Amino acid sequence: MEIKEKIREILVNTIEGLNGKSLKYDEQLITTGYIDSYEIIQLMEVFENEFFVKIDIEKISLSNFETIDAMSTLILEMKGESHE
């Protein structure tokens, strides 16, 4: 499963209010109120366990969790992979 699809699946299964929603990769999730700082912490834990990464504290920013695209880039960076 592609990383973006896996992130979408995690979001829909983890975040209340996203259940059953069809999310676009560039859909703004913080700006629209779907996720907040509490959910970001929740997602960090899930991502670290699911993708076997450690998210650096300095990488915790709203922009890194705003969209599925941004989350995918963050995870790939933490894995040491290119996000091209």
Predicted regions and their residues:
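Phosphopantetheine-dependent thiolation modules in NRPS/PKS and related acyl-activating systems
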Residues: E2-M44, N49-E84
